[in-house]
Amino acid sequence: MGARGALLLALLLARAGLRKPESQEAAPLSGPCGRRVITSRIVGGEDAELGRWPWQGSLRLWDSHVCGVSLLSHRWALTAAHCFETYSDLSDPSGWMVQFGQLTSMPSFWSLQAYYTRYFVSNIYLSPRYLGNSPYDIALVKLSAPVTYTKHIQPICLQASTFEFENRTDCWVTGWGYIKEDEALPSPHTLQEVQVAIINNSMCNHLFLKYSFRKDIFGDMVCAGNAQGGKDACFGDSGGPLACNKNGLWYQIGVVSWGVGCGRPNRPGVYTNISHHFEWIQKLMAQSGMSQPDPSWPLLFFPLLWALPLLGPV
């Protein structure tokens, strides 16, 4: 082929290589997370402060609040699978968006700040094991553009095991849902926060075997609340985070999934246990962010084939 031919071939092959992955997706779940600026009504809860839960978002359909959501990275957020169960065509996510960095679930139509922190959803992924009932109630949403981090918008941490959080009494759940079973969150629809205790699954199963309503607590669930009731997630909080602090960083250990009423005694809220889905989350985020072959690379070889006969030895 000669030196000129070899040089041309090398240039074409270099151009035909794999495209670089998007920088925000190259290392999922590995960047800084779980930090917040503010350190200081879900049922029995109180108004939150802006920046206290910077990973909290509002999953919206045609700009109406549907569920809570938590930010994991620049392009990924976590919610509950049942938030989408009445919407059959998830291959078309048009109309779905996520709002971050706002205390209210109903920001003003004229708010530029809300407009610039609203991100359309490009893909929706339900757990492949979700069958429309309680177990495996978890979903990932991929955003169409990278989220800009600010002091009011930050990702939360995840980890493969949540065993160390069992029996903690100082975890928190946040959301814009009902403040009582029969009372919606009033205007100005401010994000609510409430402190809850983690209840081990053996005790939780025992509680749900009592009385007339029986419900099984599966291995991928975690319960939180208190024996007296009054502190719980409620309708509209679904998909939001159950978070605990560890060494100054916040970790999401659960996703709001279901409950019997809201804040009833001996009826804790039930959450999807993140640790049972950590590998699925990690793999999906990594696979979706992998390099893809440039679809134009085969076309680059046609000029090469045409030029080779013309390239003699130097």
From Swiss-Prot:
Residues covalently joined to lipid (GPI-anchor amidated serine): 288
Active-site residues, as the UniProt record annotates them: 82, 137, 238
Major place of residence: membrane
Signal peptide: 1-19
Record keywords, A-Z: Cell membrane, Disulfide bond, Glycoprotein, GPI-anchor, Hydrolase, Lipoprotein, Membrane, Protease, Serine protease, Signal, Zymogen
Any one cellular-component term (Gene Ontology): plasma membrane
Role noted for this protein: Could regulate proteolytic events associated with testicular germ cell maturation.
UniProt-recorded name of the protein: Testisin
